[in-house]
C-alpha cells in the first residue's frame, strides 16, 4: 500500500543511485544525553558527518560544550543549536560562543526555540544573526518549516515565516559564512516539494537541508509529530496506523526519501541540498538505516 497521495498522476521512481546521491553529506541530530549512549561515533557515522547538538531548555552549557568537544575530537563537524529564547543576554551569548570556539566549533544553528516566554532580550534567530557574536563561524544555519509554524503565524498562514526567510536570504548575501535552512521533519514528499518551490518563487535561495525522521516506532513518531506541530504530512502516519498489517512495524523513511530523491534527480536545480535526520528511534538505528540504504553515503568511518 502506498503511503503517499500525490496530486500528479505519475511521480518519477528513484533508483538506488538517486537515493545514494540524495543522501550524500547527510547530517544527524543528538542531545548530550543521547550522545552518551554512543561509545564511538566513528563506528556508526561517515567521517566528517555534521552532527547537530540540540540545546534543550535546562541543559547546562558545560554539557553542551563537553559533548561538542567529544564529537569533534572523533572527527565530526559539530553544529550546536543556539535557541534565542533561552539566551538571557549578550554576555551569555558571547560566553557560549567563546566556549564553543575554544573546543573548535565553527558552526551553529540559529533558531527561536520552543519556549513561550523568552528568558531575556532575544526572541528570534534574526537577533542572534545581527548580534555580531558569530564572527569567525564558517557556517550559520537557520530553521525552516515546510508545513508552517503557528508560533510565528498564528493565523495559519506563512506570511511572517516567508518575510523572515527573505530577511535571512539578504543576510546571507552580506556575510562570509555559508548559510542553509535546516527544517522540521516531515513524512510526505508532496508538501515539501511545493514548499521548496515556493521558497524559490519568493526569492529565498538558501539551500534546504530537509528534516526527516529516522526509523522509529509509529507511536513514537506520532507523539513527536503532534508535539512539534507537524501538519499535513501527519496524515501519512495516521493512515499507516489504520493499516493493521503495518501498525506494529517500525516506520522507515524509505518512501519520502525515494520520492524526494527521484524529484531531485529529475530536477537538478531543486533547492534541497542535503538530508538532516532526527533519530527519534535511536542514533544507531538511524545510522544503520542510512548505511543499508545509502551505499557509500552511509559508510561509517570504521567498523564497530
Predicted features along the sequence, with ranges:
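Short acidic/polar active-site loop segments enriched in Thr and Asp
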Residues: 106, 179, 273
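Hydrophobic, aromatic-enriched interface-forming segments
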Residues: 156-174, 178-200
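Active-site beta->alpha loop and helix N-cap motifs at the rims of alpha/beta catalytic domains
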Residues: 2-163, 170
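Active-site pocket-lining/capping segments in soluble small-molecule metabolic enzymes
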Residues: 30-32, 124-148, 158, 164-167, ...
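Short, well-ordered secondary-structure micro-motifs
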Residues: 120-121, 152-154, 193-194, 219-228, ...
